[in-house]
Amino acid sequence: MDIKRTVLWVIFFMSAVMLYDNWQRSHGRPSMFFPSATQTAPAAAAGGASGTGATTTTAGEVPAAAAGAAPSTTAPAAQAQLVKFSTDVYDGEIDTRGGTLAKLTLKKQGDGKQPDLYITLFDHTAGHTYLARSGLLGGDFPNHNDVYTQLNPGTTSLTGDQNALKLSFESPVKGGVKVVKTYTFTRGSYVIGVDTKIDNVGTAPVTPTVYMELVRDNTAVETPMFSHTFLGPAVYTDAKHFQKINFSDLDKNKADYVTSADNGWVAMVQHYFASAWIPQQGVKRDIYAEKIDPTLYRVGVKQPVAAIAPGQSADVQARLFAGPEEERMLEGIAPGLELVKDYGWVTIIAKPLFWLLEKIHSYIGNWGWSIVLLTLLIKAVFFPLSAASYKSMARMKEITPRMQALRERFKSDPQKMNSALMELYKTEKVNPFGGCLPVVIQIPVFISLYWVLLASVEMRGAPWVLWIHDLSQRDPFFILPVLMAVSMYVQTSLNPTPPDPVQAKMMKFMPIAFSVMFFFFPAGLVLYYVVNNVLSIAQQYYITRKLGGAKKKPA
């Protein structure tokens, strides 16, 4: 029994350490176990054959000034304005300085009835900066520091009979080039069309490069206590797939990612929500990510444009996603975009679990009851393994008095004590590890479900019953955490009492320690653990009673 408990404690300890290590990596700190790519391989030189490595690749000519910054003192001052707009999914503001998306509120998250659930994704205030901007490189061309003029000002709201809203902004002429930037907002869509028309109004050919970037600070938003998720830039290409970039690596100029591709996208990821520039596929572009201010970072692409003769123009089309990390929707927008909803190392198990949770919800219509039913189905699938574990625990409980007697008898001779215990196990046909393996097999599934519930924006604002109005927030009255503590205490009391007094005290202390931590967990997560514990108690009670009845029957 001591061996089994030791194994379980080792598993518990390792799980706690791995969760802490994941928290470390999610916050941009180095892993305790896994070196970053920059520690294991030298970064490739800019323009090298591998196309990866950011130690020598920066944004180059991309201006670093944030939107809203004062124009150069050598240029005549121009007054920028904020153009407000509204659609069925967005309320936002476009800054005429650069034609930059300076504010974007996702009002559909509140379904128009719960303003407290609205999320402001893009913003530019004294305390928070998060922008989507673009411009030209390759000469003294218009960029995000120049003041644009709104074309055809008028309707800035999506009316009932409109399917799309277009807002266009024209730059001043610089370097013989004029830019017209058009945003297209489509009804019901979180994908914004961004068309950059480049007119050569000069007398010589020009070869500009379009840059598109996301700029933000490292301030976390809507992150549950004790449940930290990734915040920062990300890059996706066919060659390297999904690559997260930690802010700490950008601080040290040691980030490692693909810097050249003709496919994929760049993104800024946070809990529940993301934004991503998605250039045209098949068009060569450079990728960059860097720190541009003590608290500001950016990730973007630079896409060269073929030479434009005088009097001619060129169009560069791209898409800008800004919305919730709804897995099915993301899959239909761009290859790999669903990976911004990051399950980490348990993705292979978590994705099928979320698919099943979605299917259940499509029939039930309530995410809380869907969690309950999914937990019930998982427990049913693992019932044979759980039964084997509980049977082993019941048999160990029966022989515990004899084990204690042997320990007392041979306490001065550990070798004889171990031999006697092994002989007892052999005689009674008990495997001291019999209860461990079934538990170990189930651990990845339960960890996966934890990450599914933590990462799914569908839980945000989703009610369950009575006092639970938002499964992504903590229980306002702490009823579920109390039930969690009670269920853990009952479950612990059903197990054999450890012979070691220290272990016995720790087993009694665990429900209290866990309940304190779960007081701050999202209600959906606590609901899952409560249901899982209650079902485990029912299983253990049933199997123990069944074994007890079977033993009495022959007598």
Swiss-Prot record:
Belongs to the OXA1/ALB3/YidC family. Type 1 subfamily. Interacts with the Sec translocase complex via SecD. Specifically interacts with transmembrane segments of nascent integral membrane proteins during membrane integration. Keywords: Cell inner membrane, Cell membrane, Chaperone, Membrane, Protein transport, Transmembrane, Transmembrane helix, Transport. This is Membrane protein insertase YidC. The keyword Transferase does not apply. It is a multi-pass membrane protein. One of its GO terms (cellular component) is plasma membrane. It is found in: Cell inner membrane. One of its GO terms (molecular function) is membrane insertase activity. It comes from Burkholderia lata (strain ATCC 17760 / DSM 23089 / LMG 22485 / NCIMB 9086 / R18194 / 383).
